[in-house]
Structures are given as C-alpha cells and as structure tokens.
C-alpha cells in the first residue's frame, strides 16, 4: 500500500492517547483532524465531553524516578507531553504520587487542543476506518460497536478483552473525621490520605459483607477476565480472607497517630486493616476510595462501604462501575511505533494496544503521534531505546508471547537490564536504570 498524499492526519478519539497524538502531530506543523464522538454519542462510563477524561482513578501514580511510571512521566515531560504539562498544572496533594483535579485537568487539555490553529476538532462518530489519510486510531477500551467491528476485522478476529472497574467517590463533608486520620504510607511526602482503620473484628465483618454482596449483572455473555491492576474489590476479597490485607487494605506504614482514641486491637500501634481515601478534586471536597473498584449493585455499595469506619453516613457522589475493555493482538499486528503491520498508513494508540494505565496510554499516543508525523514527512521511524521506559513499553507489547498476551503497566522488569555486575540494592539499581534512561533519551533526541 502506498503512502497517503493527504495534507492532514486523522486522529480518531480524544482520550489520553488521542489527545497526546494530536498534539504531537500538530506541534510538528501538520494539520490534524481530531474526531471525538462524545458530544454526539455518549459512552457508558464518560461523564463529560472533555478530552482526556479520567474515568477511573484521578492518580497518575508514583512520581519518583525509582518508580518506573515516575521515570516514564519524566521522559514524557522531556518530550513535551500535553498530558503531563496539563497534569502538572492541575495537581492535587497525593503524597509521593501525582494526582490531578480530574475536571480542571481535562478542561485544560480540551481548551489547548480546541484552540490549536492546526487542529480541527470534529464531534462525530466514526464507523469506518478512514483510507483518505494517515490515521491514528485511539478510541480506547470503550470503542463504539460499529468501529470495533472494523478494528476486529483488521485484527482478523474478535481479539481479546478484560473487564475494568472504577472506584466510588464520596463527599468529604459527610466523612466522620473523628474516626479517620491523615497520613501517607511510611510518612512519604506530605500527609495526603485519609485513613480509615479497622480492627480485626471490623475487618472480618466487612469481608463477610463484601463477599456475599450482590453484584450488578454483566452486559455481556462472555466470561469475566480481569486485569490485575484494576480488579474489583469483591473479586479480590473472594480470593482469600487476607488477600485485601496485602492489597488496598494493607496497614503497614500507616500507624495510628499519637492522639488516636478510636477502637483498636489491644496495644497494637498499627491497625489490622486500613481503607485509604484520596483527594479527587482541587477543592478537596471529593475523595475516592483507593483500590475499591467495584461492580456491586449501587444499593449494596452503600450498605457495605458504609461499614468502613468514618463512612457510616458517607454520601456517594459516584458509585463504582465496571465495563469491558478491549485490546488488540499487538504482538502480531503492530510494530514498535504502534504502526499496523497490515496497513502502514494506520497507527493505533492507547489501552486498545495492550498498554495499561493513564500514563502508559498517553505515552503510546506520544509515540504513535510522533511516528505518524514522521511518516507524513517521509522521515525514518523513531524507535526509542529499550533502555528507556518509553521505548521498553512499546517493545514489550509488540514482542510479547501472543498466546498469553495481557495488558501491561510500565515496570522496571521490561526495561533492558544494566550492563556489568548486578546492583544488589534495589533503590540504587532503579536510580541507575533511570539515570541511564534519561541520558539515552537525551542522546536519542539530540541525534534527530
């Protein structure tokens, strides 16, 4: 297939990946037609028509360079990521993590793209894969049925899927502050989480209620298949009595404050279990229940989650929901630039490629956008070094074992190992990997 001679590039979908791709293309002087169906047709999970809307958590996760996603964010900042820049401008307190005011952040991304002179925003549903120009498809895990059928045809079948869930959000003014305390785990960064401590007796009663609560019916006949990073809390609870104690209800590093007077197990300094609440908006009026993605019926959510100390009278401004997320057989279908092996004028980006997480989705859009622009200009494809986070992630999703392919968060395990003797101290090893990654990225960019 010959390269398109169109004078613009299509980007379909204005989520995190599509927004990033559109910006990266436009900043390279190429006109963009950015299609977004929200405003014409709603999705089950989106609440607004803003671009790059966050439908699950409001956290971009760890911000330290000793954390792989922290490294990825720093690499993206050096590549002038619109998602990172607007995220920074709308940060809310989150200890050692990066969390954002979800509405302010999405509104600022939307305004920047809508006001860009080279970006033509078209509010319309696309049901066919365009063949008039180079195209980036970033319609996400909530792709409309009509377009999904065409993408599945490109895939040669129905592809894969998993179920994703979002956590409830509560009104802070309805929390009983006498039963909770402000603290970040291990006192890392500023104290940014409200902690709801549980005694063993409270936890056991909560676990029983959670595992016997009624779930909402699925809209699909297909077998449930969850991504481990966004598993419903009730599914986690059913895996074992202590599973949650090693996950979102882990108490380590969250000792009682000296002035705590609530119930506790004997003289223990640490609760048996802790439920954490994280600020969800800049005003600090909304908090989400960390790690409590759920698919329980709404009435059951209210009944069970009001068993959490401090939330007995909590008002839920949004209940948790679950939805199907689709992703492609990327190892067989895509190159490391997220370009289709079957159609070189076609790129894919976002969670549909098998990257998992807000930051990872935006990163895939950044890579796809840069390379769509380079293809337009008839320049050589840009493959980032495997020593970097932004290079290792696309390499992983396009080289994994197709038979066992699952969505992947960025992590140090997929980044090329350091040369020389192994550094035994994990923190020092991660610091060395990050230092090498940023140096290699700078070298890569300087050579362009």
Swiss-Prot record:
PROSITE patterns: GIDA_2 (PS01281). Its cofactor is FAD. Its EC number is 2.1.1.74. Disulfide bonds: none annotated. It catalyses: uridine(54) in tRNA + (6R)-5,10-methylene-5,6,7,8-tetrahydrofolate + NADH + H(+) = 5-methyluridine(54) in tRNA + (6S)-5,6,7,8-tetrahydrofolate + NAD(+); uridine(54) in tRNA + (6R)-5,10-methylene-5,6,7,8-tetrahydrofolate + NADPH + H(+) = 5-methyluridine(54) in tRNA + (6S)-5,6,7,8-tetrahydrofolate + NADP(+). GO terms for biological process: tRNA methylation; tRNA wobble uridine modification. One of its GO terms (molecular function) is tRNA (uracil(54)-C5)-methyltransferase activity, 5,10-methylenetetrahydrofolate-dependent. GO terms for cellular component: cytosol. Its main location: cytoplasm. FAD binds at residues 13-18. It is found in: Cytoplasm. The keyword Protein biosynthesis does not apply. It comes from the Bacteria. Catalyzes the folate-dependent formation of 5-methyl-uridine at position 54 (M-5-U54) in all tRNAs. Belongs to the MnmG family. TrmFO subfamily. This is Methylenetetrahydrofolate--tRNA-(uracil-5-)-methyltransferase TrmFO. The gene is trmFO.
């Amino acid at each position: 297939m010959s390269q398109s001679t169109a004078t613009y590039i299509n980007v379909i979908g204005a989520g995190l990946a599509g927004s990033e791709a559109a910006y990266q293309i436009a900043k390279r002087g190429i006109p963009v037609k950015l299609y977004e169906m929200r405003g014409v047709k709603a999705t089950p999970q989106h609440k607004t028509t803003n671009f790059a809307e966050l439908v699950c958590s409001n956290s971009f996760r760890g911000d330290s360079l000793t954390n792989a996603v922290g490294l990825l964010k720093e690499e993206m900042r050096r590549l002038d990521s619109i998602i990172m820049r607007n995220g920074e401008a709308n940060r809310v307190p989150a200890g050692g993590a990066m969390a954002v005011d979800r509405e302010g952040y999405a509104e600022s991304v939307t305004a920047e793209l809508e006001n860009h002179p080279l970006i033509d925003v078209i509010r319309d549903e696309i049901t066919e894969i365009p063949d008039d120009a180079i195209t980036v498809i970033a319609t996400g895990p909530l792709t409309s049925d009509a377009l999904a059928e065409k993408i599945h045809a490109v895939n040669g079948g129905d592809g894969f899927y998993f179920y994703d869930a979002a956590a409830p959000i509560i009104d802070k003014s309805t929390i009983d502050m006498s039963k909770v305390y402000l603290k970040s785990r291990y006192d890392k960064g500023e104290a940014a989480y409200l902690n709801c401590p549980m005694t063993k007796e409270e936890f056991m009663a909560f676990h029983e209620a959670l595992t016997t609560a009624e779930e909402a019916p699925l809209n699909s006949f297909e077998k449930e298949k969850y991504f481990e990073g966004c598993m419903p809390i009730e599914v986690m609870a059913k895996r074992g009595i202590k599973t949650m104690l090693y996950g979102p209800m882990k108490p380590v590093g969250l000792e009682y404050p000296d002035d705590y007077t609530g119930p506790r197990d004997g003289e223990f300094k640490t609760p048996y279990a802790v439920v954490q609440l994280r600020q969800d908006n800049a005003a600090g009026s909304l908090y989400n229940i960390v790690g409590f993605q759920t698919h329980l019926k709404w009435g059951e959510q209210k009944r069970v989650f009001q068993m959490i100390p401090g939330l007995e009278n909590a008002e839920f401004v949004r209940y948790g929901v679950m939805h199907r997320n689709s992703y492609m057989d990327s190892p067989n279908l895509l190159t490391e630039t997220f370009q289709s092996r079957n159609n070189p004028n076609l790129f894919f980006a976002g969670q549909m490629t098998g990257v998992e997480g807000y930051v990872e989705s935006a990163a895939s859009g950044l890579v796809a956008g840069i390379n769509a622009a380079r293809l337009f200009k008839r320049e050589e494809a840009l493959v980032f070094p495997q020593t970097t986070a932004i290079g290792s992630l696309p390499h992983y999703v396009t080289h994994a074992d197709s038979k066992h392919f699952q969505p992947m968060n960025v992590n140090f395990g997929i980044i090329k190992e350091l040369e020389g003797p192994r550094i035994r101290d994990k923190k020092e090893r991660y610091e060395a990997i990050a230092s090498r990654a940023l140096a290699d990225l700078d070298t890569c960019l300087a050579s362009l």
